[in-house]
Amino acid sequence: MICGKTACGKTTIVKGIANKYNEVKSYTTRPKRKGETDEYVFVTKEEFDKLASENKFINIRYYYTEYGLWRYGTPLEVLLNTENPMLILDEQGLENIQNKLGRDNIISILIEADETVRLYRSLNRDEATEQNTREIKRRIKDDDIKFKKRELYNYILDNNNLDELQKNIKFILNLDLN
């Protein structure tokens, strides 16, 4: 499980190691960002609520944003039936899944990045409207509250150098999978 604050590089990292690990994509009701392709399974509110009512998610998270309520769900069946699953989560999602599947069954990695870098990345990946800027700043501020339980993680790594970080993650995962 890869966790980290907004724009710390989680998706980039997962794409860089996807040849050995299989990404489990969360479902979401949020709109696609400009240039975003397949990072999530995008569904309507109605589709999400139907899947949730059928207990198809092991983890559900709700985020109140400048744009309204966004829903995220981790598909249970896909997670359980995927060999070497790789999943991007927030801290509460990690804790939920650890409680359900057992902490010893999960390798958890927290990715950290400087707040200035995260703000720069966020502003450059989204259209720079006043509403987007408010939402980005809200998320970055909110992350300071949502990422405090360092004891949940097996590893905590800095994303100062992407190539070095990917090497470290591959090394960690190979050690834990062998």
Residue ranges and their predicted role:
Residues 2:
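Hydrophobic anchor at the beta1->P-loop junction of P-loop NTPases
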Residues 10:
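Conserved lysine of the Walker
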Residues 13-14:
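Post-Walker A alpha-helix
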Residues 28-85, 90-93:
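ATP-dependent small-molecule kinase phosphotransfer cores
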Residues 84-91, 101-124, 158:
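Conserved phosphate-donor/acceptor-positioning beta-strand/loop module used by diverse small-molecule
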